[in-house]
Amino acid sequence: MGEKAIDEDKVEAMKSSKTSLVFAINGQRFELELSSIDPSTTLVDFLRNKTPFKSVKLGCGEGGCGACVVLLSKYDPLLEKVDEFTISSCLTLLCSIDGCSITTSDGLGNSRVGFHAVHERIAGFHATQCGFCTPGMSVSMFSALLNADKSHPPPRSGFSNLTAVEAEKAVSGNLCRCTGYRPLVDACKSFAADVDIEDLGFNAFCKKGENRDEVLRRLPCYDHTSSHVCTFPEFLKKEIKNDMSLHSRKYRWSSPVSVSELQGLLEVENGLSVKLVAGNTSTGYYKEEKERKYERFIDIRKIPEFTMVRSDEKGVELGACVTISKAIEVLREEKNVSVLAKIATHMEKIANRFVRNTGTIGGNIMMAQRKQFPSDLATILVAAQATVKIMTSSSSQEQFTLEEFLQQPPLDAKSLLLSLEIPSWHSAKKNGSSEDSILLFETYRAAPRPLGNALAFLNAAFSAEVTEALDGIVVNDCQLVFGAYGTKHAHRAKKVEEFLTGKVISDEVLMEAISLLKDEIVPDKGTSNPGYRSSLAVTFLFEFFGSLTKKNAKTTNGWLNGGCKEIGFDQNVESLKPEAMLSSAQQIVENQEHSPVGKGITKAGACLQASGEAVYVDDIPAPENCLYGAFIYSTMPLARIKGIRFKQNRVPEGVLGIITYKDIPKGGQNIGTNGFFTSDLLFAEEVTHCAGQIIAFLVADSQKHADIAANLVVIDYDTKDLKPPILSLEEAVENFSLFEVPPPLRGYPVGDITKGMDEAEHKILGSKISFGSQYFFYMETQTALAVPDEDNCMVVYSSTQTPEFVHQTIAGCLGVPENNVRVITRRVGGGFGGKAVKSMPVAAACALAASKMQRPVRTYVNRKTDMITTGGRHPMKVTYSVGFKSNGKITALDVEVLLDAGLTEDISPLMPKGIQGALMKYDWGALSFNVKVCKTNTVSRTALRAPGDVQGSYIGEAIIEKVASYLSVDVDEIRKVNLHTYESLRLFHSAKAGEFSEYTLPLLWDRIDEFSGFNKRRKVVEEFNASNKWRKRGISRVPAVYAVNMRSTPGRVSVLGDGSIVVEVQGIEIGQGLWTKVKQMAAYSLGLIQCGTTSDELLKKIRVIQSDTLSMVQGSMTAGSTTSEASSEAVRICCDGLVERLLPVKTALVEQTGGPVTWDSLISQAYQQSINMSVSSKYMPDSTGEYLNYGIAASEVEVNVLTGETTILRTDIIYDCGKSLNPAVDLGQIEGAFVQGLGFFMLEEFLMNSDGLVVTDSTWTYKIPTVDTIPRQFNVEILNSGQHKNRVLSSKASGEPPLLLAASVHCAVRAAVKEARKQILSWNSNKQGTDMYFELPVPATMPIVKEFCGLDVVEKYLEWKIQQRKNV
């Protein structure tokens, strides 16, 4: 092992008692008296509230997103070794880092000392957008590099030993809602020694035509041996004490160093609430633990019995405090034991890397034993026949099998789980077994994310001892363990085990075993997707015995005949697993005509975002006497509010008051939103009208205390004499609960629908489509800070897309003139529409509380509250009738949409135009379109990226698919025959269609075949499907048409005395690169004066500053994908004014000097002449401010028929961006929008309970795309279409339209499922029971896909096999 001999006296000398914590953060020493620390304080709370290191962000508070990831370095003085790994600082308790060193992203490098290569490569690969997740990403990447280079021989110069596969996994636990992950992975891969930089995506370092050496010289330097980052300072090594033993009763945190000391503490604390602490990761799942007031915290990680590791011929024993990551490492060291390797591989899919690094095996098992946690570990270790050692309250040790332990009553508080032992599996035989017996072991899990970071729908682990006989494979013994399906613990299917023991495996035997299994593995009542989970149990059993036959292919009898060929598992080498490496290609043209506009320059502030120095609202230092707020919301859909009280009628710690509608000052109004159709209430008054409606705003002395206290609030309700709430669209229609849509916003007819239907040769009547909702999942939740100012004024810092409307809302709520309010927004950590209307009540509540208490008040809304109160995308139900010719040409379409607006209108009246606009991407002949906007007792829905358009576009695809199915014609032909001609495009879209040259969709349709090899790959897909039973592929290409509107936008450009330039716009930087495009436009426009300074040099002189509603008025909103170009145009107008003022000065200087004039001398002269060097403007689009965007995507997927898992093998996108203002920024928008669309179509299930309260309210229950769920090959071409005089330098929008193209994945999945259903039909002798047309729901989650492939597909297959044999 290379460990040094350890002198026992040395060990004893290191043991010491102490009364303070000593640790380092970014090399700085911190010492805190234990008596001054609340032991429940998390590391992220300390970092953000007590240190200047704000790069650590809070994204979820559950260990599920990675925004708070930091590097922890731990020194072992006995081994003189430093271990370094990432941790989730939102779960790690501050007291547990004693003697450790913490490195944050700004500790790796920053603008003062120089950025780290990780930061610079993230920036250069265009891998940051809103930037809120980027510091955590940076630390994850750095940790991967650090550990790869520590554990391998020195890498070649400039590179790391990190492999490309490891690079992908390095960020697999970090969530990003903006980028689509591809550039982040490429940035990390750029360090890998086995990657060619030229194979990576579009970046700032690699230019066409350059040789490899030139590119490498431009890459930010990385040298693992000379890094300026000191992750563990020397002073800490000198100070560190190996053990900390605290006996004093005055401290609430203790760290015993022996079991006896621990038991003594437990005995002394008899009757008090005690929390044993190791990794503390359980609080991410059991969040009520954070609210519980423990009187004593006992850190048990320094007790040798809990951290011991033993490996010998008996097996591997692991102390209960061994982390999951350490356990994986230990099991992998047992090179010749495949069972342990399989256990380790399965364990790598538990949680994510930074949770596994601190979460312990004992903690995981105890959660299963005490709280019925759906543990993977418990299941696989029961099957591995693991045993546990327990120390009872009487100090005696007992040993049980893990299975026995899990079945016992919950372990009492004074008994301890000491260790867990996995027996040796070196021998392939058991006592008394035949010499020819083979011992087999496999583990299984089905989860929405292949690489983990998601609970399993079902997990399982099987072991079997088998022998080969003349008539087949005999099962001598087996253990079949299932878990995570709603049972209390991992469950052995003993009836199935007993039945199989002694049996020769055959179709008939397996069918009977499956029948028994379905009776035995029954999900508990209330478990989600029970049928799917039961089906998975059958699948895993089937896969296990299928894999068994592959190992014993000599058998000639029964269903084992032919081994893997017959079963069909993985027989095609092209069948890709989700772990396949990502690859990509980009085809981009950088325009030089208006340089630097048109160039793919790095996003403004990208390195600041990566290092974590970019300031978001919650990063602003708290003003003196600052208070903190948390929302109290209703859990009932329609009820009178009788009272607000706390549990046990005891005011929680730190609470200063509760603000309700009664606290609105005289002259103020109870308004929470303003600026759209009607104003929403800030607080419910006498009656709450929906679950999730805000009732009050609790104010406390810290955010932690505010959040805890808000969860302890009890609302007393009364529903007597109230009508039942309206919770469905059908109830809304039945009760005429509808909002009026203004006539200009309603759907409109195109052509004569009656005539179109009469011309049809075929009709499909009354078909239906449904859509659920979607949550924004911006990484930064809603946040605001309100600071009272003199003369009854209020300054509010708001994370908003709509500063002007926030401003108006606050003024109206406080009853003050608008000039008393100032709203400032610098940047937003992701918006997607959710920081428009929904940001207003957050800022208004802070302002109201600040006004009442005359102290600053801020809030950072916790993730659960944010998910429950913000509404999300509009659910809808669609009914359509369509008429068409035999060649597939559609002649008429009638569409009726029921739209769930929720409680208030919000932006819902705008939705019909979006739905219809995107639907009209095809020529429907004649179109009748009508939308009913329904009022329900649910939280008001609002705009979410491509609102209405994404549903409208998909409605079109669903109709096309149904027509194709009806006619038994290739769906691609139906799409093609219904594409618009330019004439029909003008008919449907009027002036928005523009000129003939602007209609590029037919070009894209043909180009995608060449770009992606679409038609050739279709044939390959057909061949694959013909030769594979259990994996089916589908491929589909889908077009999109998206209408956008330009809005008036103000701007100001000021040149300061030193020649530096300040630009101000009211467009908000939310990650879309608005500041970057604005800077490019200013540099180009000012460069037209031609005074010896290039546009690129001018670019470095420009700073875009925060939005301020008193500095610039009439700012409207940042929405609709066009704010970047509108802001750029406003700035261009300003610059033109400045150039006009400067030209006479330049001319005079040239005449005076007779030589060239520099920029600095020109500005100096202008200042001497007192020329106004600040110009304001307001861009006002003319009547041609509307235009259409075009794109097309081809996606290929592979569906696992047995589990419902979908792997996106490849996506190719071609998007017409006009003449892109910045192709690097637009590429990021295209990829990010597409991946967010993937979430809507494939992953993100938005669920409510029977009262309309959102229950998918955490990272545990709501799954956005991750790096392992995006296309394995992801290619994008940005079409550089021609000049268009009515647009800003011929550019087009890119933020929202590409999201619609994610429907190509859904359509491809439908094609794959269709092939699976055809296969089932071929096994059915009477050809009944599986319709060829089906409406695949959105999202097509794993349970949905499996259901449509057939929950009983295994049984049908076996029945068919048995019948085939009988017929022979």
From Swiss-Prot:
It holds the Pfam family Fer2_2. Binds 2 [2Fe-2S] clusters. Binds 1 Mo-molybdopterin (Mo-MPT) cofactor per subunit. GO terms for biological process: abscisic acid biosynthetic process; auxin biosynthetic process. Residues 246-427 form the FAD-binding PCMH-type domain. Residues 19-108 form the 2Fe-2S ferredoxin-type domain. GO terms for molecular function: 2 iron, 2 sulfur cluster binding; aldehyde oxidase activity; FAD binding; indole-3-acetaldehyde oxidase activity; iron ion binding. Its cofactor is [2Fe-2S] cluster; FAD; Mo-molybdopterin. Strongly inhibited by iodoacetate and potassium cyanide (KCN). Weakly inhibited by 2-mercaptoethanol, dithiothreitol (DTT), menadione, estradiol, 4'-(9-acridinylamino)methanesulfon-m-anisidine (mAMSA), allopurinol and tritonX-100. Not affected by p-chloromercuribenzoate. In higher plants aldehyde oxidases (AO) appear to be homo- and heterodimeric assemblies of AO subunits with probably different physiological functions. AO-alpha may be involved in the biosynthesis of auxin, and in biosynthesis of abscisic acid (ABA) in seeds. In vitro, AO-alpha uses heptaldehyde, protocatechualdehyde, benzaldehyde, indole-3-aldehyde (IAld), indole-3-acetaldehyde (IAAld), cinnamaldehyde and citral as substrates; AO-beta uses IAAld, IAld and naphtaldehyde as substrates. PANTHER family: INDOLE-3-ACETALDEHYDE OXIDASE, XANTHINE DEHYDROGENASE. This is Indole-3-acetaldehyde oxidase.
